[in-house]
């Protein structure tokens, strides 16, 4: 059913261009309504149609990592479902896992609008949302209600960010506060110290500050939930090595590479039409195709420096099966995407999943784990 709509998706993108944030919120609310009504005859039928259109079953892509089962390696990146209101639906759209948030301990409205811009010539998005969300306590309530109605049938992660009002020297307590509310509502957690849209946040990637955050979180992590750190694509090698060392010291599950970039050097867009300003003057992080190669480069660097012993979730600029494959052979065990999903619609997930299966067949590999880091073997 939904495959019949694919030719019309560019029209949807065009219609939503004037208000991308509003269109996205409308989509999330629609998915939330579907989740709430899934037990009805009509809702159950719609979910079955989603499953038929977007879910691909391939045992060669199934992995168990950190005690969690991933039916395929393609996950939803943080930033899409900030409040977790569609948490019960992402599995029906073909994702192997989903990361919710970013969420902060304290509710915050984010930055002034407009704050989300599509750069179609670059297949990119400029976002300066500012971690707008209702706070960790409300998200915990939302997810508890969803899990009562819908099974948690894919691994769910939550991206934790520091509240804007919290001083940098109190960041550790802020992250722990969010974790305490949400610990029972997700399968893994991510320490976001790399968003460019919270003042000073990126400084928390530095050794001493990140050390205190990870130490506090692991002390609070009584159930040993897998804990990751998400890093910036703008880091130099020395800074990445420091984070690798801390990740190993604090027994992190892995590293997510990477978040958005503040660099503008790979953009063809020079003027932001919505404001008339030069793109270099516009605050915010760039996601999508412009960070594809840099994120893949960092994945390879981490894999080589850790000899493949620290798992990597690769994210940034995935639009095609080749993009996904290149991150896997560079060293990523799992993948995430969001911007590609916006530009190409939900069909991108089954396309990539099938494409990964085709790659395995071409190389005579029997399982996706055999391809991880194969560039360095």
Swiss-Prot record:
Enzyme class: oxidoreductase
Enzyme Commission no: 1.3.5.2
UniProt pathway annotation: Pyrimidine metabolism; UMP biosynthesis via de novo pathway; orotate from (S)-dihydroorotate (quinone route): step 1/1
List of residues binding substrate: 82, 127-130, 192, 197, 259-260
Lineage: superkingdom: Bacteria
Any one GO MF annotation of this record: dihydroorotate dehydrogenase (quinone) activity
Main location: membrane
Free-text comment on the cofactor: Binds 1 FMN per subunit.
The family this protein is said to belong to: Belongs to the dihydroorotate dehydrogenase family. Type 2 subfamily.
Protein name: Dihydroorotate dehydrogenase (quinone)
């Amino acid at each position: 059913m939904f495959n019949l709509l694919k030719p019309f998706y560019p029209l949807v993108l065009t219609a939503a261009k004037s208000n991308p944030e509003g269109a996205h919120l409308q989509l999330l609310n629609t998915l939330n309504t579907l989740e709430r009504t899934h037990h009805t005859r009509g809702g159950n039928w719609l979910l079955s149609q989603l499953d038929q259109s977007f879910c691909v079953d391939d045992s060669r892509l199934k992995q168990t990592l950190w005690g969690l089962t991933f039916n395929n390696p393609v996950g939803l990146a943080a930033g899409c479902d900030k409040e977790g209101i569609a948490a019960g639906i992402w599995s029906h759209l073909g994702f192997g896992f989903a990361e919710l948030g970013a969420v902060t301990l304290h509710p915050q409205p984010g930055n002034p609008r407009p704050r989300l811009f599509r750069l179609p010539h670059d297949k990119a998005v400029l976002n300066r949302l500012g971690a707008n969300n209702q706070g960790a306590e409300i998200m915990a309530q939302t997810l508890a209600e969803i899990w009562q109605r819908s099974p948690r049938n894919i691994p769910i992660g939550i991206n934790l960010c520091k509240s804007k009002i919290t001083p940098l020297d109190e960041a550790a307590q802020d992250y722990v506060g969010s974790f305490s509310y949400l610990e029972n509502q997700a399968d893994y957690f991510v320490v976001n110290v790399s968003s460019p849209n919270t003042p000073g946040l990126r400084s928390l990637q530095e050794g001493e500050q990140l050390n205190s955050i990870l130490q506090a979180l692991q002390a609070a992590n009584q159930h040993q939930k897998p804990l990751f750190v998400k890093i910036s694509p703008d880091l130099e090698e020395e800074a990445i090595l420091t984070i690798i060392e801390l990740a190993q010291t604090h027994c992190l599950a892995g590293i997510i590479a990477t978040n958005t970039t503040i660099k503008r050097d790979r953009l063809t867009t020079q003027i932001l039409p919505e404001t008339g300003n030069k793109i270099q003057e516009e605050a915010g992080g760039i996601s999508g195709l412009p960070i594809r190669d840099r994120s893949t480069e960092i994945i390879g660097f981490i894999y080589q420096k850790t000899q493949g012993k620290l798992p990597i979730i690769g994210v940034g600029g995935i639009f095609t099966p080749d993009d996904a494959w290149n991150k896997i052979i560079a060293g990523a065990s799992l993948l995430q995407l969001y911007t590609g999903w916006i530009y190409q619609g939900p069909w991108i997930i089954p396309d990539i999943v099938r494409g990964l299966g085709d790659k395995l067949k071409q190389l005579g590999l029997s399982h996706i784990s055999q391809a991880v880091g194969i560039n360095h073997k």
